[in-house]
Curated annotation (Swiss-Prot):
Residues 264-327 are annotated as: Alpha C-terminal domain (alpha-CTD). It is found in: Plastid, Chloroplast. DNA-dependent RNA polymerase catalyzes the transcription of DNA into RNA using the four ribonucleoside triphosphates as substrates. It comes from Sinapis alba (White mustard). This is DNA-directed RNA polymerase subunit alpha.
């Protein structure tokens, strides 16, 4: 077993690239480290970063093809070696690089015989092809083939829902994921209570961006997700008439009361003292100070009433609900 030595900072949190290579036009690899981290931090960051790398980074794909030469999705065209389905699959694999917003409509227009590759796609200036040699189709006879394309920038997956044969237009399954794979591993070092961790992150991309660019993009997206939590005060949102309204769930204290009353007679509640509920000492003392001595006293208070009590928190309401659920 070969052990690799990596120099890491022992005081200031730092990251560095320890390996970077280009295996092909459509396969880049990078390995990065972040250290020093306290125990548990490496796993937290590694899981979040891997998910952000695979799901939060945008990519550009061909999402639709249209041609008068294409009669049906799975048919064969005279003068073309590949079936329509094979051509659509080849278009699906074309790797594009762009920062575009919205959609663009490039096209292919070629006269046979000959090979059609990604080089034959006429693109707008804002879009680049990563590998011009990617195969699309083979024309075996002197025919003209023109295909209109639609490209979009998005994230995740976009699965075609239906085929529109009437206008000879066909949706293409798109995978807007420039990061093909991402792994993380953790190395611990130090003695006793002084143990620290090094986080290793491995990234493979399709060539539309480098692993270093992917790491930066994923980090920025994670930061943007957490920015709202940095505001000290909770914001009030006002919905327009045409926006969807969502009812936020509240702790079902009232529902628990209704359920309990259905199971038992309310008269019995006044004979069940909170001493019998096996409450944590702090919750028990808070209730006693507020003159809540029986289960009936407790259930006659709303969730809001309980939270207003001194030293009584929302977590205590949750705890009470759990205890009542078991009774």
């Amino acid at each position: 077993m070969v052990r690799e030595k990596v120099k890491v900072s022992t005081r200031t949190l730092q990251w560095k690239c320890v390996e970077s290579r280009r295996d092909s036009k459509r396969l880049y690899y990078g390995r990065f480290i972040l250290s020093p981290l306290m125990k548990g931090q490496a796993d937290t960051i590694g899981i979040a970063m891997a998910r952000a790398l695979l799901g939060e980074i945008e990519g550009t794909c061909i999402t639709r093809a249209k041609s008068e030469n294409i009669p049906h999705d799975y048919s064969n065209i005279v003068g073309i070696q590949e079936s329509v389905h094979e051509i659509l699959m080849n278009l699906n694999e074309i790797v594009l690089k762009s920062n575009l917003y919205g959609t663009r409509n490039p096209f292919i227009c070629v006269q046979g015989p000959g090979y059609i590759t990604a080089r034959d796609i006429i693109l707008p200036p804002s879009v680049e092809i990563v590998d011009n040699t990617q195969h699309i189709a083979t024309l075996t006879e002197p025919i003209n083939l023109c295909i209109g394309l639609k490209i979009e920038r998005n994230r995740g997956y976009s699965l075609k829902m239906s085929n529109n044969f009437e206008d000879r237009s066909y949706p293409i399954d798109a995978v807007f994921m420039p990061v093909q794979n991402a792994n993380h591993s953790i190395h611990s070092y130090g003695n006793g209570n002084e143990k620290q961790e090094i986080l290793f992150i491995e990234i493979w991309t399709n060539g539309s961006l480098t692993p270093k660019e992917a790491l930066y993009e994923a980090s920025r997206n994670l930061i943007n997700l957490f920015i709202p939590f940095l505001h000290v005060e909770e914001e009030t949102f006002y919905l327009e008439n045409n926006q969807h309204q969502v009812t936020l769930p509240v702790f079902p204290f009232h529902n628990k009361l209704v359920n309990l009353r259905q199971k038992k007679k309310e008269l019995a509640f006044q004979y069940i003292f909170i001493d019998q509920l096996e409450l944590p000492p702090r919750i028990y003392n808070c209730l006693k100070k507020s003159n809540i001595h029986t289960l009936l006293d407790l259930l006659n208070n709303s969730q809001e009433d309980l939270i207003k009590m001194e030293h009584f928190h929302i977590e205590d309401v949750k705890k009470l609900l759990d205890i009542l659920e078991k009774k």
